Regions:
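Conserved phosphate/ATP/ADP-binding segment of small-molecule kinases
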Residues: 147-152, 160-229
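Positively charged, low-complexity intrinsically disordered leader regions
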Residues: 8-24
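Short pre-catalytic strand/loop immediately N-terminal to key active-site residues, enriched for Gly-Thr
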Residues: 28-33, 231-242
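Conserved small/polar residues in nucleotide/adenosyl-binding loops
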Residues: 247-253
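A short acidic, amphipathic alpha-helical/loop segment
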Residues: 66, 138-145, 167-171
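Histidine-anchored nucleotide/phosphate-binding helix
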Residues: 38-46
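Conserved N-terminal subdomain of the carbohydrate kinase-like
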Residues: 20-32, 47-130, 144-150
Length: 257
């Protein structure tokens, strides 16, 4: 296996939310912090590549210094749309003592409601494509704009899209290499009770590999009739689990080649 930390060659296109979060756990509460799938994917991938390209949208309320922070880590923000007079996507949630359980308090789509992704020409031959958790039609619009098929396409989704846009999601699944979802979503998408049966059915929908996220219990990788289990790193005190699944998207890319 070739190590792919060749920072000038490993081009990664990241598509997803750049957002604000307000989070409450038993350890404390925040009013508004920077969140979003694309934000954390970019930060977690930056030690391995200086050729990261971002496609997302924010309002003019998003702090400029956070964008500069990404750029200093090698993230190209040409594809980040900044909508004047509009507000950035906002999510608020509360985690239970069991942090696998959370309640959504408020969701403000704001700029995300009318987001039409534009992939700059310089992005369209990216070697790796990470499609964060977005409306399936938005993910498909990105796929349609690629000039060459990336070597690896990873897609993350959730039960809300399965409930409301299943047909669009199934279309996109035919074009991806890896799908990442949690165990509850795997059961819902497949209609199967056991994760092994669920994985077999889902990989027949298009993805060559399926990663099932299981929170504090780690994750499961299915593909090519094989199963690989990886544990979570044990921590004495977990402050905020929100971005864990986002950074998880980076791992398959780092280990792909």
């Amino acid at each position: 296996m070739q190590y792919i930390c060749e920072k000038t060659k490993m081009s990664i296109l990241v598509v997803g939310t750049v957002a604000f979060d307000a989070i409450e756990t038993k350890h404390g509460k925040t009013d508004k912090i920077v969140g979003g799938a694309a934000t954390y994917i970019c930060h977690s991938a930056s030690p391995f590549s200086k050729n990261i390209k971002l496609v997302s949208v924010v309002g003019d309320d998003f702090p400029k210094h956070e964008i500069i922070k990404l750029e200093k880590k090698g993230v190209d923000t040409l594809g980040l749309q900044i909508k004047k007079g509009e507000k950035t996507f906002f999510w608020s949630g509360k985690y239970h003592d069991d942090m696998n359980i959370r309640d959504t308090i408020e969701t403000q789509l704001n700029v995300l409601e009318r987001f039409v992704p534009h992939v700059p020409k310089s992005y369209r031959k990216s070697k790796f494509l990470m499609l964060g958790n977005l409306m399936p039609s938005v993910q498909q619009k990105v796929l349609d704009q690629m000039q060459e098929r990336p070597e690896l396409i990873i897609l993350d989704t959730m039960n809300f899209w399965m409930d409301n846009f299943l047909e669009n999601l199934l279309k996109s699944l035919k074009e991806v290499d890896i799908l990442t979802i949690n165990d509850e979503e795997a059961r819902q998408l497949s209609g199967e009770d056991t994760l092994v049966k669920a994985a077999k059915k889902i990989t027949k929908m298009g993805p060559k590999y399926l990663i099932i996220k299981k929170g504090e219990h780690g994750s499961m990788l299915f593909g090519e009739e094989k199963i690989f289990l990886t544990p979570a790193y044990p921590l004495e005190r977990v402050i905020d689990p929100t971005a864990v699944s986002y950074t998880h998207l980076t791992l398959p890319t780092i280990n792909w080649v």
